[in-house]
Amino acid sequence: MNAESLRKLFDDVRRGKLTPDDAVARLRHLPFEDLGFAKVDHHRALRAGMPEVIFGERKTPAQVAAIFSKLAKHGVNVLATRADEKQFAAVKKKVRGAEYRELARAIVFQRDRKKYGKGIVTVVSAGTGDIPVAEEAVVTAELMGNDVQHLYDVGVAGVHRLLANRETLGKARVLIVCAGMEGALPSVVGGLVGVPVIAVPTSVGYGAAFKGLAALLGMMNSCASNVSVVNIDNGFGAGYVASLINRL
């Protein structure tokens, strides 16, 4: 439940469309609903600006479907990250309108399509191999009510591809830059723009990349002062933070 749905609930009571007892029944599950294996946080949108997001890894299809359907019944947008097709099959039996975004490995249910962001969030990937992480950021930012554009495969091995898109970079209010290997691209982008750059190290690379650790350390030591960093492969975290920045 978010602030808008709470206002509607109170308004329905005021207009006589809903009895006080019905309203109490709907509010009973605030702040959370105990399913035994999960305590579903229905209050999170009021506190944090976005409903609880389901991390699909290590959850059974039945668990994901149960949590997803409980959130969907409260009239909010729902997102499950790191989800697979078996989990989606279980979800779509319970939630009509749920969609699976294969590249992002995300299940989405979007009821609220209002735009809350003040500008454009641009998601950049260094290579094609970084796109799944970038797409997780795209899906997250879109579901949080942002205008999102993407720019893929513009890494430093062919920096002219990036420079040819300086106009696109310049239109962004917030940038998310995903890169593996040595993780140089966020620093390059940071030197070209005057807005926040959220760097996402990916686990793409050969042995000494250490599954994204080399990129993470490189990004944390960026000389570009507008670069901040999230965890390895954490496109969701980048999309979430970019959305909060874009609302300021």
Predicted regions and their residues:
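Glycine-rich oxoanion-binding loops at beta->alpha junctions
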Residues: 104-108, 147-168, 213-214, 230
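Short glycine-rich or small-residue beta-strand-to-loop segments that form or flank ligand, phosphate
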Residues: 53-54, 120-126, 175-177, 230
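Short glycine/serine/threonine-rich phosphate/pyrophosphate-binding segments
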Residues: 62-64, 130-135, 159-160, 179-189, ...
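Glycine-rich phosphate/diphosphate-binding loop of Rossmann-like nucleotide-binding domains
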Residues: 118-160
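C-terminal binding/interaction regions
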Residues: 125, 166-170, 174, 204-248
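Glycine-rich phosphate-binding loop
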Residues: 164-202
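Long amphipathic alpha-helical segments
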Residues: 1-84, 88-89, 94
